[in-house]
């Protein structure tokens, strides 16, 4: 049974830019850099990477469910650090870890290795936020979850695949 069988949809498909709409901008010269250049990212670019991730329970994107929002993306380019807050649809969401793993994995696959990425549950939005945050930001736990559990990796891959 779903934790949230009837989630609120904040953005409908017609008003939501798809990844394909943004694909041309990702292939522009702004993103074509030489190996020795530092590529600067902004909050919009990071948001564009995660907005189209689908929810593990519903055929909706994290943007449509208001799980990710551009104002919850924080970047410190000087330290190559990204902090992204996400808000589960209900305080008892059992999919929070999978959503967080999907966000982390999408960013890990998309960003240069120099970036440290922390994905955190928005404070006060989940009943087990400290436990979820601890698991999501422990490299060994994340690696173990993705490397040793083919079912978790399959779900994460399904969530982050481009539609």
Swiss-Prot record:
Keywords: Chromosome partition, Cytoplasm, Cytoskeleton, Nucleus. InterPro entries: FSCA_dom_sf, MIP18, MIP18-like. Its main location: nucleus. One of its GO terms (biological process) is protein maturation. Disulfide bonds: none annotated. It holds the Pfam family FeS_assembly_P. The keyword Cytoplasm applies. It is found in: Nucleus; Cytoplasm, Cytoskeleton, Spindle. GO terms for cellular component: cytosolic [4Fe-4S] assembly targeting complex; nucleus; spindle. Component of the cytosolic iron-sulfur (Fe/S) protein assembly machinery. Required for the maturation of extramitochondrial Fe/S proteins. May play a role in chromosome segregation through establishment of sister chromatid cohesion. Belongs to the MIP18 family. This is Cytosolic iron-sulfur assembly component 2B. It comes from Dictyostelium discoideum (Social amoeba). The lineage of its organism: Eukaryota, Amoebozoa, Evosea, Eumycetozoa, Dictyostelia.
